[in-house]
Amino acid sequence: MEDERSFSDICGGRLALQRRYYSPSCREFCLSCPRLSLRSLTAVTCTVWLAAYGLFTLCENSMILSAAIFITLLGLLGYLHFVKIDQETLLIIDSLGIQMTSSYASGKESTTFIEMGKVKDIVINEAIYMQKVIYYLCILLKDPVEPHGISQVVPVFQSAKPRLDCLIEVYRSCQEILAHQKATSTSP
């Protein structure tokens, strides 16, 4: 079963949450951000090139124009490959673990897997960000030395920064799977 809902990020931008239910013990959540706007790309490129042309008219050095074009292209490629994330995915399977995938605008993907045996809980935490209180979903990892301790806090959906209403949807589904996993692991 699959459904899609629209939410907002902390800045008011649009986000699309796709929920895929494969089984009672396996669910996937995909948060998609809007693609790179052609208008903003054109505005930045024109600004850099006009500034370079202004410097060219003052200095009469053609290397300034060539450098501006080269730097703009390198900057755009770097932004698309290392910064702009189009989609973040959280896949949770109660018998295996949690997989988080970030898909960049260039097509590059970054995946992290956490074994379910290392997961203590999934919670919604709050933080102060840019003079605002924001909420974020995070995975608490068990401390291998102390059974009741937490060794690490792993934030989820770091790039999309969804608002609380979206996080609650994901949180409830994750808690259902964690409860199912605990029930099956304690039953004889």
UniProtKB/Swiss-Prot annotation:
Major place of residence: cytoplasm
Key words, A-Z: Autism spectrum disorder, Cytoplasm, Disease variant, Epilepsy
Protein name, UniProt field: Phosphatidylinositol N-acetylglucosaminyltransferase subunit H
Presence of keyword Cell membrane: no
Subunit annotation: Component of the glycosylphosphatidylinositol-N-acetylglucosaminyltransferase (GPI-GnT) complex composed at least by PIGA, PIGC, PIGH, PIGP, PIGQ, PIGY and DPM2. Interacts with PIGQ.
Single biological process term from Gene Ontology: GPI anchor biosynthetic process
Recorded GO CC terms: endoplasmic reticulum; endoplasmic reticulum membrane; glycosylphosphatidylinositol-N-acetylglucosaminyltransferase (GPI-GnT) complex
Record function comment: Part of the glycosylphosphatidylinositol-N-acetylglucosaminyltransferase (GPI-GnT) complex that catalyzes the transfer of N-acetylglucosamine from UDP-N-acetylglucosamine to phosphatidylinositol and participates in the first step of GPI biosynthesis.
Domain of life: Eukaryota
Pfam families: PIG-H
Effect of residue 103 to P: In GPIBD17; decreased expression of GPI-anchored proteins, including FCGR3B/CD16B and CD55, in patient's granulocytes
Linked pathology: Glycosylphosphatidylinositol biosynthesis defect 17: An autosomal recessive disorder characterized by variable neurologic deficits that become apparent in infancy or early childhood. Clinical features include learning disabilities, mild-to-moderate developmental delay, seizures of variable severity, aggressive or over-friendly behavior, and autistic features.
Pathway: Glycolipid biosynthesis; glycosylphosphatidylinositol-anchor biosynthesis
GO-annotated molecular function: catalytic activity
Stated family: Belongs to the PIGH family.
